[in-house]
């Protein structure tokens, strides 16, 4: 039994979500191989070979794989699938784009968002916005799985010594072409990788107040900024700051929720955080039910005082 992890990378380095997915693959009990499909991605393949627990790295190199087009990556995975019992993808935007294509082409049922490996064919995954855990079993010979990265600790990025094997690149499917990419530059940590997150809700009242109140606290803590869906929908924060079931799933060491009531959809995206601090003037706010520390106070007074204390 051998599992293949489809690495997420930028052709130069391996993304953190891959490390969590390797941990999930290792829990299956067999060998773990990693596929690095890209262009001029030798550095990423070398980095994958250093990941603890990886037995082999497969490196497919072609111009058609340079930008991670889902159709071409799926074709590459399909070309290798017969040699593996499990195909694992991080449950990121990229992984969720490729995995269903692979499952459909293999005519198997995808197992999505797993948070625990029970056995080689049985897994746990959250349902109903995380309010229940489903145990699912797959009878397919090849199991296509997406891994909720917050459910598994990352594998060590160093300490491994896997061999890197070049494999033939699949032909360009030709169904899509890469047009361009707009990358947002920020001095703050990336939201899903941040160790500390300061999030704001609709109670902040405006984009100006959102930034005025929360930015000093985030600066003091070296934190990423997040937001509830209500705050994003109101225009207080950009879409890529949204935390929740329809946003980003996070599990930082510290999550500070200011003016967030705690709708079930938001809780689904952050309740695995190690320490949760909630600031809200409503004592009945649902956010207090998951908070480790709760401060019943007006955030416009409490947050500046907290900044001063830090």
Language model: regions and residue ranges:
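N-terminal glycine-rich FAD/FM-binding segment characteristic of electron-transfer flavoproteins
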Residues: 1-310
